[in-house]
């Protein structure tokens, strides 16, 4: 029994890998091509040794067959197909058809590159510099095809705006502040006045009127005022700046003061005071345009000039009817004549009072300092005047 038992017992226990030990597995994984023949030889040897013991092994523990997929990792992944879209894609995808996506590649400048904020670098679809700029193909319109209807409408609107821009040129040339004042005063719509499309349309709370209409109305008003002032000045060529200022008060239009040959405006106080720079240094950087007198020869009398201008102003007020001096004095009311005469009397009294106190001997009697100058026991012979 001992001999039969020893003969029926297998010589070794088969590993679950079909006769493969750990050392052979590592060597085969390291060099699969070189060890192909050795693997086949070891497999055949293990099969020959396991033949007497196949009856004692279960059916599931049969030797594992050699598969090429074991030594080719790339082939172990299932290939994607149309029937199995969930499969993992291959490492090298097929080239994508460019079509119309890349015909405009680097045909325009990159706006972010100009601002210095482009993060795409060389992968950017726009040109980074003039040397990187390309030209689109000549038949790009045929490749792209006709644009949608919405884009055609936008282009038509842009063309209409381009056509309307020359008509808006006078608006730009005029004073911007005047236009803003007209818009605020008349409550006009800003977008409509400057040629833009108002998003509110007929529901807008502001008036949709052309700005040039209100500008023309204000221009006509100014022109009529200037014409009336010019006619008045032409009727009286001998009037001075004060007369023009009086007319300006009636017409509420700014009228420039009279000018000399050099184009310098002569004010009311023209050459009425000496130039300090000319008196100290003998030179003035303004020259003949200086408003101050360079020497006594150029000095004017300011009082006489003001009185003359006042007379001209009175003449401009009474320009419709010229009345002689005697008749004008006779036509004055009694109260006005009395007031004029009383005013003259007051001025005469003031002048007499100044002349009366002009003597130094009389003035020094006002204060009490002269008492200290008298000798002790001496009294003043002249009474103090009040």
Swiss-Prot record:
Q: Which InterPro entries match?
A: ZFP36-like (IPR045877), Znf_CCCH (IPR000571), Znf_CCCH_sf (IPR036855)
Under the heading Gene3D superfamilies, the entry gives:
Zinc finger, CCCH-type
Taxonomy-wise, where does this protein's organism fall, top ranks first?
Eukaryota, Viridiplantae, Streptophyta, Embryophyta, Tracheophyta
Write down the PROSITE patterns for this protein, in alphabetical order.
ZF_C3H1
Q: Cite the GO molecular-function annotations of the record.
A: DNA binding; DNA-binding transcription factor activity; mRNA binding; zinc ion binding
Which residue intervals are annotated with compositional bias (Basic and acidic residues) in the record? 151-166
| Record flagged with keyword Metal-binding | yes
Q: From which residue to which do the C3H1-type zinc fingers run?
A: 104-131, 183-211, 269-297
Species whose genome carries this gene: Arabidopsis thaliana (Mouse-ear cress)
The record's keywords, sorted A to Z, are: DNA-binding, Metal-binding, Repeat, Zinc, Zinc-finger
Q: What is this protein called?
A: Zinc finger CCCH domain-containing protein 39
Instruction: Identify the Pfam families for this entry.
Output: zf-CCCH (PF00642), zf-CCCH_2 (PF14608), zf-CCCH_UNK (PF25427)
Which GO BP terms apply?
regulation of DNA-templated transcription
**Polar residues bias (residue ranges):** 20-37, 72-85
